[in-house]
Amino acid sequence: MKTLRFPAGLYGITPEWDDTDRLLAAVRAAAAGGMTALQLRRKLADERLRAAQARALAPLCRELGVVFLVNDHWKLALDVGADGAHLGRDDADPATVRAQAGAGLLLGVSCYNDLRRADALLAAGADYVAFGTVFASPTKPEAVHAPLQTLTEARARLLACPAPRPAVVAIGGITPANVSQVAQAGADSAAVISGLFEAPDIQAAARACAAAFSVNP
């Protein structure tokens, strides 16, 4: 029986690369190492490039068996046939998106270090709640810190949910060297950007991150 609404393991988050061919090759390498989900996160790209990369990644992820989400732009996620969308505090209201997009679109939400926010967004239909940054992050150096205990508390709350339950995702400064800490703290999945895509060997980095969750039921 499926136990989670969102796949456990390594959740890759795309870097700010304009070279789409380079990005696709990196995604293939990460998937070969065991990445289970991917989020297109392009904060600096223009609308045309963001859409083009989404259209390129959606069929590739289907081919690779990787769940594909788009950050912020849930209508783009629907347009390209992505599996889901990730929404932050300043993005669309998750309850509104759920009402308009229906149950078929996976919704992930940023909860920072706020368990009460997580409770509210789960009630609004979120499929995973993301907490972070758990470690110092080169992507968001000024971001709020979420201690590992937050993951433990979130996991304890969600274990009472009927299967398939929402997932707990950790984000922020995660690398192959520290990913086991978030898995042991209770995260179902680790969202990784530079620790994956800036690694000298992307496939090896993915394999190391994925392995941390193979022993975390």
Swiss-Prot record:
It holds the Pfam family TMP-TENI. Gene3D superfamilies: Aldolase class I. Mg(2+) binds at residues 72, 91. It catalyses: 2-[(2R,5Z)-2-carboxy-4-methylthiazol-5(2H)-ylidene]ethyl phosphate + 4-amino-2-methyl-5-(diphosphooxymethyl)pyrimidine + 2 H(+) = thiamine phosphate + CO2 + diphosphate; 2-(2-carboxy-4-methylthiazol-5-yl)ethyl phosphate + 4-amino-2-methyl-5-(diphosphooxymethyl)pyrimidine + 2 H(+) = thiamine phosphate + CO2 + diphosphate; 4-methyl-5-(2-phosphooxyethyl)-thiazole + 4-amino-2-methyl-5-(diphosphooxymethyl)pyrimidine + H(+) = thiamine phosphate + diphosphate. It comes from the Bacteria. Belongs to the thiamine-phosphate synthase family. Condenses 4-methyl-5-(beta-hydroxyethyl)thiazole monophosphate (THZ-P) and 2-methyl-4-amino-5-hydroxymethyl pyrimidine pyrophosphate (HMP-PP) to form thiamine monophosphate (TMP). This is Thiamine-phosphate synthase. The gene is thiE.
